[in-house]
Amino acid sequence: MRLIRIGDISIARVWESSIRLPLSQLGPVDELIACHRDWLYPRFADLSDDMFEFNWQSWIIDVDGFVIVIDPCAGNGRERPAIQPLHRLDLPWLERFSATGYTPERVDAVFCTHLHCDHCGWNTRQIDGRWVPTFPNARYYFVDAEVRRWDPDAPGYREVDYNANVFDDSIRPVLEAGLAAIVPADHMIAPGVRIQPAHGHSDGHCVLRVDYRGTRLWFTGDAFHHPLQVSDTALNLGGDDDPALAIATRERLCSTIASEGSYFIPAHFAAPHAGRIIGAQEGRFRFVPLGY
Ligand SMILES: [Zn+2]
């Protein structure tokens, strides 16, 4: 699926790659599976083995002609030995990007929900051995707490193997080209388009809230990796800087999205990639896939 339509908003999807993961990697899920079979199969788990499709994909949104790219995937030619599916990729992501009808030159803004390797890779591409910004006319929005988290030269830097080399090949070249705007966690980038804090998965992880002609949606990055986390916010895939804060963030997002009646588009969900959240019994929430 290349285009998602929600209210007056069209969102183009640029797929990079996918893997299959076991639902059990999220934590104890047997009871939840029993309660949510009606929407879980076959899109969000395979009935034969309870594996789910985990996508790497980016979003392009056009708000009154202002074009924003959200979470530009992992990128080609990166040294990512700790994550083999992203190591030294050579994939036609840029060709798929152009197939949406948008060119990189047409992009006004790039927003990375956080600076993990799979959310900022295509910030840059390699030309003649140098990393250069992929979107030459865009302003790249980086949240200040997230830049502090991942700059290896920042005081107290905590290294993690899965994010080695990312700052040098995907962030620093954008800073040096003068295309970056380092902004607070609550920041408006265009009318109706606002960065909002959603910390926990990483120190400065944020989401993007869009409110356009009465349609409200949230690009929630890695606040959720699988829709079952809507019903049990303690489930997680690991790799959180602050797991307790990540849970609190999920709970807050669930109640906000449910009470607004808005849609959310996480970074990694399988088709239809987006959905709503409704209140369910005992203060729990329930995911409703787009189109249901
Ligand atoms: Zn991710």
Question: What label would you give each PLM region?
Answer:
Residues 16-17, 72-75, 115, 145-146, ...:
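Active-site metal-binding loops of divalent metal-dependent hydrolases
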